Amino acid sequence: MSATTSGTASAAELAKFSAMADAWWDPEGDFKPLHKFNPVRIAFLRDHFAAHFGRDIEAPRPFEGLSLLDIGCGGGLLCEPFARLGFAVTGIDAAERNIGTASVHAERAGLPLTYRCAMPEDLVAEGKTFDAVLTMEVVEHVADVRLFLDSVGQLCRPGGAVGAATLNRTLKSLALAKVGAEYVLRWLPRGTHDWRKFMKPSELTAGLREAGLSVDAIAGMTFDPFSGTWSQTTDVSVNYMLFATRAAA
C-alpha cells in the first residue's frame, strides 16, 4: 500500500478504523452510534430485499438461497443479522484487524460467515457477483468514489439489489454529524468523518446510475434525543439510505 491510497482504500482511513477494531461489538464504545441505528438500517434493507426478491419476512430464514456481500463490513454488525435471515454472507474490509474481530465474533456466535481482507475491486477482478450488495456508511471514507461505485455495480448480479447509506453534505450535517457528534456529544472519535467527502443523494444516485443501477427508494434517519432512539424519516438532510436494483438479464 502506498503512503496515501491503494485502489479505493485510503491509508489514513484504514489506520483510523484499525485502531478502533476491538471496539466494534461494544454497544457503549466507539461504534455506539452504529449499534443505536442498526435496527433502522436492518429494517429498511430487509423490507426492500423482501419486496424485491419476493420473500416472506415472517419466514424463519426468508433469504435462504441468496448471497449477500457487505463491503466495508467492519466488525460484522450487519453481516450477522443478515446471516440469521438466511443470506449466505460474505463480508470484506480493507482493515485486517476488523476482519479478525468479525471472524472471532461470528465463530463465537456459531454463524457460518465468510470474511476476507479485501477491497471490492479485488472481488471484481476475481469475477465474483452477489444477489445483494451492501455499502453502508462506507462511501464517505473511500479514496476513489467512482471506482468504488463502479465496483459495487459490477458485483451486483443482474436482477440483484444494492443497499447504500452515507451522510448528506449539508450545513445541517456539518453541524450535527461532524461538529455535534465528534466534538460536542463525543459520540465518535474526533476525525472520524471528513465533511467534504459526504455525498448528496443526487451525487450518489448519479454514481450508482453510472454503475448500471437504478435507485428505487431513499429514506433518511433521524435521532430523537429524548428517547435516545433512531427512526426512519423522509428527511435526508443528514443520514440517508438508498435501495437500488440492477435490471434482470
Swiss-Prot record:
Question: Which Pfam family is one of this chain's hits?
Answer: Methyltransf_23
Q: Does the keyword S-adenosyl-L-methionine feature in the UniProt annotation?
A: yes
Keywords on record: Methyltransferase, S-adenosyl-L-methionine, Transferase, Ubiquinone biosynthesis
Pathway membership of this protein?
Cofactor biosynthesis; ubiquinone biosynthesis
Top enzyme class of this protein? transferase
Which transformation does this protein catalyse, written as a reaction?
a 3-demethylubiquinol + S-adenosyl-L-methionine = a ubiquinol + S-adenosyl-L-homocysteine + H(+); a 3-(all-trans-polyprenyl)benzene-1,2-diol + S-adenosyl-L-methionine = a 2-methoxy-6-(all-trans-polyprenyl)phenol + S-adenosyl-L-homocysteine + H(+)
Give an example GO biological process.
methylation
Q: What cystine linkages occur within this chain? A: none
In terms of SUPFAM superfamilies, this protein maps to: S-adenosyl-L-methionine-dependent methyltransferases
Q: Which residues bind S-adenosyl-L-methionine?
A: R41, G72, D93, M136
Homology family: Belongs to the methyltransferase superfamily. UbiG/COQ3 family.
HAMAP family per record: UbiG
Q: What does this protein do?
A: O-methyltransferase that catalyzes the 2 O-methylation steps in the ubiquinone biosynthetic pathway.
Protein's UniProt name: Ubiquinone biosynthesis O-methyltransferase
Q: What is the gene name?
A: ubiG
